[in-house]
UniProtKB/Swiss-Prot annotation:
Sequence repeats: 3-7, 47-51, 89-93
Keyword set includes Repeat: yes
Subunit structure: Interacts with hair keratins.
Keywords: Keratin, Repeat
Role this protein plays: In the hair cortex, hair keratin intermediate filaments are embedded in an interfilamentous matrix, consisting of hair keratin-associated proteins (KRTAP), which are essential for the formation of a rigid and resistant hair shaft through their extensive disulfide bond cross-linking with abundant cysteine residues of hair keratins. The matrix proteins include the high-sulfur and high-glycine-tyrosine keratins.
Chain spans, region 3 X 5 AA repeats of C-C-X(3): 3-59
Lineage: Eukaryota, Metazoa, Chordata, Craniata, Vertebrata
Tissue distribution: Localized to the upper cortex of the hair shaft.
InterPro entries: Keratin_matx (IPR007659)
Family: Belongs to the KRTAP type 3 family.
Gene Ontology molecular function, alphabetical: structural molecule activity
Listed GO CC annotations: cytosol; keratin filament
Gene that encodes it: KRTAP3-3
Name of the protein this chain belongs to: Keratin-associated protein 3-3
Alphabetical list of PANTHER family matching this protein: KERATIN ASSOCIATED PROTEIN 3-3-RELATED (PTHR23260), KERATIN-ASSOCIATED PROTEIN 3-3 (PTHR23260:SF1)
Length: 98
């Protein structure tokens, strides 16, 4: 299956909810500290459906699709200093001034 296909996110089963930007279809989500034990600098792309992620995105870049846990609060997210970049799924993430 071509994971770079232009499709909207599928919502995974379980207590997680996939939230996408309204202006773009996105295939992968990112686990934020509220759902994963990783620090904000170690976020990894996680595919929304059953195929490998299309690319390995280095941080601090994050895709426009976030995987958030709807059953738990998100403490401290307002204090995180994140810079996001909108980009096609399959192009390498090249942040400027991060």
């Amino acid at each position: 299956m071509d994971c770079c296909a232009s499709r909207g996110c599928s919502v995974p089963t379980g207590p997680a909810t996939t939230i996408c930007s309204s202006d773009k279809s996105c295939r992968c989500g990112v686990c934020l500290p509220s759902t994963c034990p990783h620090t904000v600098w170690l976020l990894e792309p996680t595919c929304c459906d059953n195929c490998p992620p299309p690319c390995h995105i280095p941080q601090p870049c994050v895709p426009t699709c976030f995987l958030l846990n709807s059953c738990q609060p998100t403490p401290g997210l307002e204090t995180l200093n994140l810079t996001t970049f909108t980009q096609p799924c399959c192009e390498p993430c090249l942040p400027r001034g991060c």
